[in-house]
Amino acid sequence: MQETGSPLSNSKSLPERREAITDQQVLIVGGGHVGLSFALLLAHHGIASTLLEKNRYPTISPTDDRTRSHYLDSRNTALSRRTVQIYQEIGLWDELQSHACRIDSVQISEQGSFGRAQLNKVEEKVESFGQVIENAWLGRKLLLAAQQSPLIILIDNASVNTVAQQADGVTLSFSSDGEAENEQQLQASVLVACDGRDSTVRQLLNIGTTTYDYQQTAIVGVVETDRPHEHVAIERFSPAGPLAVLPLTDPEGDGNDKYQHGYRRSVVWVCPTGEETKYLEDDAQFLQTLQQAFGQRAGTFVAAGRRGAYPLSRVLADKQVEGRCVIMGNAAHTLHPVAGQGFNLCMRDAHVLAQMMS
């Protein structure tokens, strides 16, 4: 990997790459899952792009599948069938599916209420309802694919300073390591901002937002149960907040092989803000509380991994297009995770925009 702050594409020498930057049709700010996916969608249509990411990308070996990084996230994402189809279209799904677990059935219930709703892939006549994938694996494969594409130039450790629009394009200035003397300028026909909920580009364009604080926090982690998941996703509504338990693949098996203490599942539990500490500190207490809220639908919870807490709010950009700039991903709309559609909505936006630009 090249030194931080330089383009990462290995198809050209550094001077050639810097010269090529000025010829790019599209600038993308934000190199997370949405930004990388959009760059790959553009490349699929033969459109060149330059992507700026404020963080340092991790060093990844294409031959070492065990590589992980905190940058690539320790959470899991439920991919809809449409999102899976999009990755199939650009030829990436074969690389992703070894760490993805399909959802064949969905169960929905409410604590203290009789009955439940259940969806089954056979009855609905679909291959599956989607896939649950490790964010670390998804990010790793997206980054490797972007680094290997001759149509994508990656620049990491880059902070955007200014955005100026002209009749026929956009000029953006950025600096490395946050130092003004390192400032550089890029030009392109279109700028697409995928730089997250607190988007710098959105703020520089003076695009306002409508924000709602749910006063809730999502507790996210991985647990193990004594019963195989059988590719069932379960959503349980409890007084403490909605709780989802999703099937996960075993890193060394097919998702139903026993792993360490039991069978792996992803947990997303929404609780009132201020109560998250009790879900994070003591594993035994967390498992006991989880068992009480969930019952035996997934079997007995026997182990818990490290958990993270993520404050929840809804953020909607007042507009998603301003001149030659497009706001996309969480910069455009950050949603509550209860339906698991945030990333999938972003992917639909990215797919449609790439098609329009082609």
Give residue spans per PLM region:
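FAD/FMN-dependent oxidoreductases across multiple families
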Residues: T277-S358
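Beta1/beta-strand and adjacent pyrophosphate-binding region of the FAD-binding site
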Residues: R18-V34
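A short, basic/flexible loop-to-alpha-helix module at the beginning of a structural domain
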Residues: Q2-D23
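Conserved FAD/dinucleotide-binding core of flavoprotein oxidoreductases
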Residues: Q118, S238-P311
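Conserved N-terminal helical subregion
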Residues: R17, I21-T22, R81-E89, D94-L204, ...
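Central beta-strand plus flanking loop segment that forms part of the substrate or channel wall
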Residues: D198-A233, P239, L243, C271-E275
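Glycine-rich FAD pyrophosphate-binding loop
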Residues: V29, A43-D73
